[in-house]
């Protein structure tokens, strides 16, 4: 029976179509793909055993499970993963790589000390990242790469000690940033918040801040919490750039002084909370530039109710007539303690107008220069404004292109023009009235002569009379008095004598200012001098090399002369004798015996005397002059 059931391999290869289709390669591939899809679906629908899953595995809760690392088996469909209150210390690279749909990741209240670079790879859709109540000591900037959709980042209550520049520049999409309760924070860089141009909410509460950090890059910030810090004073410019800020909380920040114009940059502010501080007074008209301010909290401050607080009482009546709980009560003097500030009136006090202790002084300047008109009152609680010559009232924050009122009341001109000439009035105000002081600004037009290599000199000369012409034929004329004016290129030469008719003519001369060389001319001259020096040096070097080579060649020729024969031809004057062809010229006697064989001089027809070897020649005054030329073959000598 078994043999009948068994198929031979050949039967399988050549059997019916059914058997061939059973082993079709395409069918095998399709089956494999189905298995992979099923496996993926199984993984996508799995839930870690220690966690609870809901909403078709899109919500995974693993709270208080004593986990030391991110568990395996999390569904790829997960959109919310809560790992709150576990024992996780390190977030390793690619821990969430397969969770491409994850939107909210909660890692708060663990023991996280390290977040590796690339730990959040694959979380392209992550919207919220909670890391508060951990043990991070630095901002894990490198781990934020590729979180292009991150909107909220919670880092509250970590032992972070400093926030460096560009700490969050990798997540420009961020809208909410919670940095509260960084109790070990000691340093915030000037560029710490660079790149967060889309941030709407920033929490810096309880961070041991002693001054407000640079918040200028946060141009779209709506809400700012600075509560629980040590901000003893709020100064002008602290909120520069926060034109869209609507809510400002500075609760229990130990604020003692808010200087004049400190809030002028907060044009959109709707709510401000200054409760639980150490404020006693506020500068006059502090809230006047805040046209959108609706809610203010000033309670639990030791307010000193005197003349300087009257403006606040009037402002509260206008802005919040029914809200008596918002604005606190007087602490001093004793007779007013506990009284609501909004109920105060001028009848309670004896007040005086402000005093200007440093009035502005008249000023003479040249067009294009900077200028300042100072105006200082006896107290900083007053407000200062300026009235320009055309009647415009300028206050701090009402900036023009060139003119601005500084926080100390100074009227500053960055670049004066002739049109700025006129009288400026400083007006110092308090709750009682105003005090004014005026000063005149005189602006002199600057001479703007176009640059020229030539200028015109006007020379006035006199035509001498006939008598003067006879006596001054040999004289040049009256010596003119020359007056060079540095502010004007036109120079006038006036003669001392004015008895004759004047004639004026113009002579173009070289510009006076051209006598002083400019930097460009000096540099050009310096370059020419350096170039000449380098050229001379190179020429000298070349000449030295040529001279050395010629000398060496000449020296070599003297020591290694080529083989040659020298023939000396004597041309005698008329020599008398019987037979010139046979005559001999007697030679003087030679003292040395070994030279006796040179005893005669043969005629030109017999002048080839061959000398085989000569060891040495000794010459003296009494010896004949011998001319010797060395040769490898022949040496020819003669006696003269």
Curated annotation (Swiss-Prot):
Keywords assigned: Cell membrane, Disulfide bond, Immunoglobulin domain, Leucine-rich repeat, Membrane, Phosphoprotein, Postsynaptic cell membrane, Repeat, Signal, Synapse, Transmembrane, Transmembrane helix
Annotated signal sequence range: 1-44
Entry keyword annotation includes Lyase: no
Modified residues annotated as Phosphoserine in this record: 631
Subcellular location(s) of the protein: Postsynaptic cell membrane
Any one GO molecular-function label of the UniProt entry: cell-cell adhesion mediator activity
Pfam families: I-set, LRR_1, LRR_8
UniProt domain comment: The LRR region is both necessary and sufficient for the interaction with NTNG1.
Record's protein name: Leucine-rich repeat-containing protein 4C
Species, as recorded: Mus musculus
Lineage: Eukaryota, Metazoa, Chordata, Craniata, Vertebrata
């Amino acid at each position: 029976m078994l043999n009948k059931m068994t198929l031979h391999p050949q039967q399988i290869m050549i059997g019916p179509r059914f058997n061939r289709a059973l082993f079709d390669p395409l069918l095998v591939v399709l089956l494999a793909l189905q298995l992979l899809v099923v496996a993926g679906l199984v993984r996508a629908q799995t839930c870690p055993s220690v966690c609870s899953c809901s909403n078709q595995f899109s919500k995974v809760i693993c709270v208080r499970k004593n986990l030391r690392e991110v568990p395996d088996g999390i569904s790829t469909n997960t959109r919310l993963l809560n790992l709150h209150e576990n024992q996780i210390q390190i977030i390793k690279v690619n821990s969430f790589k397969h969770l491409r749909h994850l939107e909210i990741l909660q890692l708060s209240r663990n023991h996280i000390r390290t977040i590796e670079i690339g730990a959040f790879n694959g979380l392209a859709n992550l919207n919220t990242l909670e890391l508060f109540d951990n043990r991070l000591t630095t901002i894990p900037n490198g781990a934020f790469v590729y979180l292009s959709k991150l909107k909220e980042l919670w880092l509250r209550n970590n032992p972070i000690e400093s926030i460096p520049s560009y700490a969050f520049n990798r997540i420009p999409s961020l809208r909410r940033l919670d940095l509260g309760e960084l109790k070990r924070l000691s340093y915030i860089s000037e560029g710490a918040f660079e790149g967060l141009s889309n941030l709407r909410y920033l929490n810096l509460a309880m961070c041991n801040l002693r001054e407000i950090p640079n918040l200028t890059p946060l141009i779209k910030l709506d809400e700012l919490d600075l509560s629980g810090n040590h901000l003893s004073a709020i100064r002008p410019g602290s909120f520069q750039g926060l034109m869209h800020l609507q809510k400002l909380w500075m609760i229990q920040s130990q604020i003692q002084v808010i200087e004049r114009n400190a809030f002028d940059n907060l044009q959109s502010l709707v709510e401000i909370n200054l409760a639980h501080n150490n404020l006693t007074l506020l500068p006059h008209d502090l809230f006047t530039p805040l046209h959108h301010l609706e809610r203010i909290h000033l309670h639990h401050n030791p307010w000193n109710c005197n003349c300087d607080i009257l403006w606040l009482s009037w402002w509260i009546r206008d802005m919040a007539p029914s809200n008596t709980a918002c604005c606190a009560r007087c602490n001093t003097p004793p007779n007013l303690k506990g009284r609501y500030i909004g109920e105060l009136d001028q009848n309670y006090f004896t007040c005086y107008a402000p005093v200007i202790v440093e009035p502005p002084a008249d000023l003479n300047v040249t067009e294009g220069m900077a200028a300042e008109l100072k105006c200082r009152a006896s107290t900083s609680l007053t407000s200062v404004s300026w009235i320009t010559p055309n009647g415009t009232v300028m206050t701090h924050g009402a900036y023009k292109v060139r003119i601005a009122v500084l926080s100390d009341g100074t009227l500053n001109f960055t670049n004066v023009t002739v049109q700025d000439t006129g009288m400026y009035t400083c007006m110092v105000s308090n709750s009682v009235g105003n005090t004014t002081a005026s000063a005149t600004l005189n602006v002199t037009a600057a001479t703007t002569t176009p640059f020229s290599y030539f200028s015109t000199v006007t020379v006035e000369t006199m035509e001498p009379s006939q008598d003067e012409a006879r006596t001054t034929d040999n004289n040049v004329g009256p010596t003119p008095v020359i007056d060079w004016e540095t502010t004007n290129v036109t120079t006038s030469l006036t003669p001392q004598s004015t008895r004759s008719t004047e004639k004026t003519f113009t002579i173009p001369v070289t510009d006076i200012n051209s006598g002083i060389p400019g930097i460009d001319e000096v540099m050009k001259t310096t370059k020419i001098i350096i170039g000449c020096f380098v050229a001379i040096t190179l020429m000298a070097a070349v000449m030295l090399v040529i001279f050395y080579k010629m000398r060496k060649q000449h020296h070599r020729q003297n020591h290694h002369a080529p083989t040659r024969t020298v023939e000396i031809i004597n041309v005698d004057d008329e020599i008398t004798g019987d037979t010139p062809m046979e005559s001999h010229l007697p030679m003087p006697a030679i003292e040395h015996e070994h030279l006796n064989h040179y005893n005669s001089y043969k005629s030109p027809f017999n002048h080839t005397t061959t000398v085989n070897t000569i060891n040495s020649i000794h010459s003296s005054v009494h010896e004949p002059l011998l001319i010797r030329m060395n040769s490898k073959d022949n040496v020819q000598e003669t006696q003269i």
